[in-house]
Amino acid sequence: SLGSRGLGDVYKRQVESESELKNIINLSKNKKTVVNVGIRLNPNVNAQTIGKISTGRMQDKFGLTFKDAIKIIDKYKNSNSIRFKCLSVHIGSQILSNVPYQKMIRVVNNFLEKVSVNFEYVDFGGGMGIDYSSNKKTFDFKKLALEIYKFSKRNECKIILEPGRSIIGDTAVLISKVIYIKESPTKDFIILDAGMNDLIRPALYNAKHMIIPAIKSSKKSKKEYDFVGPICETSDRFLKMKKFQKLNEGEIVILKDVGAYGYVLSSNYNVRPMPKEVLVDKSKTQIISKRQSIKDLI
């Protein structure tokens, strides 16, 4: 909480409501310090992504409306307790089209023309997506760079981008063993030793992570495979795949592109230990997180 941490130990405090700003001002007065504040603007832009990770629409909980942001800045710009340092926007995650960013930048340009303070920074957030499927659709960074270049020619401020997923999303995999194969008339359930506690994105967002066999074979399954985990939730499932190679119990499969929102969202749900993390650098390997034991949980 703000009250339990120093106000001067971070570059800026992000504000998304007047209530937050009042709290910061009161704490600042008590501690006799001046706080750098960032205002988050909700640009009302549809990011064309999964609804649960869209953050820049009017119905989303994030940021201030154009009108409210102007009003709050005008009301508190002369306060001796804060400095409006940064304007922030972030419209969502796993975005593959540049159109939402173009719309967002137009809104920001319009806002900067009307606001009564000069921001040192504009933070455009992140959200640039990666290709989780096999259709090779990738984000066009050149188009985004051109839009940001045009913005920089128009506005004298430093620009921040947060392209985390696009950098690390495809740098990690989840390795799992087939522990059981449950046959049914229409499909086979491939039950893995990895569960939704290890990778929750499919259960949480209906996200799809491609699955490949560790050892390839030319033998194909005649039925659809439904890759699931061992947890007592129907949502503990990863992916349905047709024409997958025939698998046997004990074989290893690989879930791809888990570098972003993978391990960081994992948990001990169902009394399951966290998996081991191994860093691979060419031919070298290093354990960076040990696998938990049941004793660790207790």
Regions found by a protein language model. Give the residues of each.
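Single conserved hydrophobic/aromatic residue that forms the stacking wall/gate
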Residues: 1-7, 11
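Conserved, mostly hydrophobic/aromatic
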Residues: 5, 39, 87, 124, ...
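Structured loop/turn residues at beta-strand edges in well-structured enzyme cores
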Residues: 5, 33, 82, 117, ...
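Catalytic beta/alpha-barrel core
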Residues: 12-19
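Active-site-adjacent beta->alpha loops and helix N-cap segments on the catalytic face
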Residues: 19-27, 31
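Glycine-rich, aromatic-flanked loop segments that form ligand/cofactor-binding clefts
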Residues: 34-46
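Active-site loop/helix belt of alpha/beta enzymes
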Residues: 43-181
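Charged (often Lys/Glu-rich) extended helix/loop segments that serve as interaction or gating elements
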Residues: 147, 156-298
